[in-house]
Design a protein with these regions (language model features):
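Alpha-helical multipass membrane-protein architecture
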Residues: 1-320
Length: 320
């Protein structure tokens, strides 16, 4: 956008608002994918006392992010991930691009807001939250405010009054996690139901406007699962966790890690498509608990969580 304001023939092409929107979308998807799918997961082995595994895990989650991008391209506007469903539409970004393109009062107000943001941040004011609350839905912001007050003030006061041993506060702390896990399981069941539909049922539920058919989507997900199997095997080898397990348990871990990776995509993708939010932490927690019950060793569980945490958020952030 700034380049488009520079006089000259070379910079004229940047005046196209569609080009600006495409560039911004690419930058946004890449930024979120890098943060959620690459930088965040590599902290897990470090927190577990194995900083030497940072680079191997980074290699694995980077490959997983690339597969995520491939699958987004292949399944978007399919019966499961329809383009007509309410993905977050990025209205704020579009309005910003239009304001700068049209110049005038709206453009001036935008620069005033930018100046206020810089000044407020320099003074230590959380201007990013202020900006979000300004153009956010008033009902959603009110619900968030009430929830913050209840969690920060009322619940601690109540639990301190009724609990001496600290059991009640601990239980209440885990209630939101339980709610997210339940929501994640529902999304997984929804994905399974859509994938299990056959023949005439699919034709009744879909329209000719879909650019990706159910069969094509299934083939893409099958290819994605195969790629995730390969990445899981690579992770097991370069991180050394294969030495902690027997051959049989290693095979089970690889298959389970690939399933967790693609299931995380489906759960987070469906949640984001319908609500604009996704239970990435809950999804990773679900597969962590299942992995614990399956008896996987300590470090292999950490690699599993890092792998799972890389796929769902990347798929969702790049799609939205």
């Amino acid at each position: 956008v700034v380049l488009s304001m520079i006089p000259g023939k070379v910079f004229r092409r940047f005046k196209n608002v569609h080009a600006q929107n495409l560039v911004q979308t690419s930058i946004s998807g890449a930024s979120y994918a890098a943060a959620n799918a690459m930088i965040l997961p590599i902290g897990i082995p470090v927190l577990m006392g194995r900083p030497d595994l940072l680079i191997p895990v980074l290699i694995g989650v980077t490959l997983a992010t690339i597969v995520d991008g491939f699958l987004i391209y292949k399944v978007f506007d399919s019966p499961m991930f329809a383009a007509t469903n309410p993905f977050p539409s990025g209205i704020a970004t579009s309005e910003t691009i239009l304001a700068l393109a049209n110049r005038g009062k709206r453009s001036l107000l935008l620069f005033v807001g930018m100046g206020a943001g810089v000044a407020g941040k320099a003074l230590g004011i959380p201007m990013d939250l202020f900006g979000v609350s300004w153009f956010g839905n008033v009902v959603a912001m009110l619900a968030f405010a009430v929830g913050s007050i209840v969690k920060g003030s009322l619940i601690p006061a109540w639990t301190a009054a009724v609990s001496v041993d600290g059991v009640v506060p601990t239980m209440i702390t885990y209630l939101p996690h339980g709610a997210m896990i339940g929501a994640g399981l529902v999304s997984l069941v929804q994905a399974a139901l859509v994938l299990s539909k056959k023949g005439k049922k699919i034709q009744e539920d879909t329209t000719s406007e879909r650019t990706v058919s159910m069969n094509s989507m299934r083939k893409s997900l099958g290819l994605g699962f195969a790629l995730y199997l390969g990445i899981a095997l690579l992770l097991a080898l370069i991180t050394g966790i294969y030495s902690e397990m027997s051959v049989g348990k290693l095979v089970v871990w690889i298959v389970f890690a690939a399933f967790a990776a693609i299931a995380s995509e489906l759960v987070c993708g469906l949640s984001a498509m319908h609500s604009g939010w996704f239970p990435a932490m809950a999804t990773a927690l679900i597969f962590l608990m299942i992995g614990i019950m399956m008896g996987f060793p300590h470090m292999s569980l950490g690699i599993l969580v890092a792998y799972t945490a890389a796929t769902g958020p990347a798929f969702t952030d790049m799609a939205t």
